Amino acid sequence: MSDIAIIVSLLSLVAVLGLWIGHIKIKGVGLGIGGVLFGGIIISHCTHLYGIELDAHTLHFIQEFGLILFVYSIGIQVGPGFFASLRQSGLKLNGFAVMIVGLSGILVALIHKLFDVPLPVILGIFSGAVTNTPSLGAGQQVLTELGGDNITAVMGMSYAIAYPFGIIGILLSMWLIRIIFKVNIDKEAQEFDNNQNQQKEGLDTLNVRLTNPNLGGLKLKEIPDFESHTVIYSRLKRNDQLIVPNVDTVLNVGDVLHLVGEKATLRKMQLILGEEADVSVSTRGTIFRSERAVVTNENVFGKKIRHLMLKGKYEVVISRLNRAGVELIPNGEMALQFGDVLNLVGRQEDIETVRAIIGDAHQKLQQVQMLPIFVGIGLGVLLGSLPLYIPGFPVALKLGLAGGPLVVALILARIGSIGKLYWFMPPSANLALREIGIVLFLSVVGLKAGANFLDTLLSPEGLAWMGYGAIITFIPLIVTGFVARIYGKMNYLSLCGLLSGAMTDPPALAFANEIKDGHGAAALSYATVYPLVMFLRIILPQLLAILLWTAS
């Protein structure tokens, strides 16, 4: 067999064995994708015994390309919600997540200095203790550029030794917080639901009868606050006739307008227009319909709604716009993106015409456009290679192959589309790309680390590494958990999601979800902090490597 055939065969064997190990669960908890690392260690131990040598350059390429695929697909997945998570609603959660990341970084520096732990070892322990594989890749890359030797094998071993308690430690933290604070799960779930219902302010509807005589005879566009684009006038009922209004529709006293917008804004418009009307403005039994259609036609990507002139040409109103699960007011200045779901109101034939214009080809939502993927990866690698020179640092700081593709993916996913290129990826395709990437990366890390893993694990040095990892895992979680619970008054279920997200640990999230079956509190806080934490976990090992290398 050729060298390439041997490597591919061994990688397949590692993946099969590792994924099988990852599926083994003890009381509902398993290694998950981390099992691939241990599969690689086992196979590497066997190849070492039989003297099988694998080409280092080929393995290095596979490892780096797998890492790129993994972080890029993560960025595309979380990009639409990343910037939203930094707004007011997520500041508290993200603040505590940053606290966990910061404390772990401080502990790494202290352990490195106090116990004279080699830099590659402590960075590998750090990555394993926080169960974050991309941080391992980032640390390996920056240490290689700093001139370190035998980086991959040493970091891989220390990562693997610290990894198991990284998973166990977060579950132990959740359990201890629950016991110490005597948490009542049902009560916490009820309080969370009540709080969510109070805060939730999506789009609402209101029927208003025009009784203000000053507005009679005016065109719709002449109504006060019409230009603010905070309310959609989707239907108008005059006597028994239903009309789809446009900007030039003349209003009469007694007309009933169907408004769509946020509750506070609707009440404000009611004060201007008249009184709430207990009248049905439904399209049932009329020539009008209200239907949904999805934007898939590349010719309208990036076009503003007003440029389509749907009201003027086709007498069709867009009453709602759903983008990545968030309902938005579809004002004329809003640019359409691939995957936007529009609620259309108008005659059936007019809606069909508009449907043809915007696409509404649902099969396209399941297709993967490959060109944008490689454009994004290429731009990410370029960004990751750009040096940032900081006075006093021996090497330039770079985002690297882990950070560059992640940042570019976050930005491109937020933008949505540029011309005919769109960065939407079906969830199934994104998951497949992400899993392939992480399996390739962990397989190679395991193959490189496995030769001396068992000897190291059973040595006093290996036991010390496990202890350092336990400290880095446990202390930031328990300290932040106590602070968030006592001073932040954080809901326990949300706190469990926060701890899982701060460690970017899906098995921990699965455990948190099982605390209260069918409740989404943990998943919501996990998703809120995950994007920022993933970014910080990739940047932090690079900063630590440069700072500690410079100080030594």
UniProtKB/Swiss-Prot annotation:
GO molecular function: monoatomic cation transmembrane transporter activity
Domain RCK C-terminal: 190-275, 277-360
Domain of life: Bacteria
Transmembrane segments: 4-24, 29-49, 65-85, 95-115, 161-181, 370-390, 402-424, 438-458, 463-483, 492-512, 529-549
This protein's record includes keyword Transmembrane: yes
Localisation per UniProt entry: Cell membrane
GO biological process: potassium ion transport
GO cellular component: plasma membrane
Sorted UniProt keywords: Cell membrane, Membrane, Repeat, Transmembrane, Transmembrane helix, Transport
Bilayer topology term: Multi-pass membrane protein
Intrachain S-S bonds: none
Protein family according to the UniProt entry: Belongs to the AAE transporter (TC 2.A.81) family. YidE subfamily.
Record-linked HAMAP family: YidE (MF_01016)
Name of this chain's protein: Putative transport protein APL_0966
